[in-house]
């Protein structure tokens, strides 16, 4: 069995979700978001969202909601998304 890992859900579309990887590693690129409020967001250790590491998953593989981004972290995520990531679909 594979290890369960936290993710940030960015988009939900029918049976699929677009997610960003969450890691305990330090930020290493401008597209990485260190979560200032990681503890109140349901994470056990200081964490970084890698907005440059996106994946598309089936909703059926999601296990449970750990938490929700704080307003401040959500604003910072949106800023990084629009200024650094700018995906083309």
Question: Model regions: which residues?
Answer:
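C-terminal terminal-subdomain/extension
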Residues: 40-89
């Amino acid at each position: 069995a594979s290890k369960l890992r936290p993710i940030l859900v960015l988009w939900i579309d029918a049976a699929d979700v677009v997610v960003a990887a969450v890691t305990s590693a330090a930020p290493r690129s401008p597209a990485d978001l260190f979560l200032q409020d990681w503890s109140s967001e349901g994470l056990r250790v200081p964490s970084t969202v890698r907005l440059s590491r996106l994946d598309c998953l089936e909703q059926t593989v999601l296990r449970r909601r750990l938490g929700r981004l704080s307003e401040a972290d959500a604003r910072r995520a949106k800023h990084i998304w629009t200024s650094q990531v700018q995906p083309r679909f």
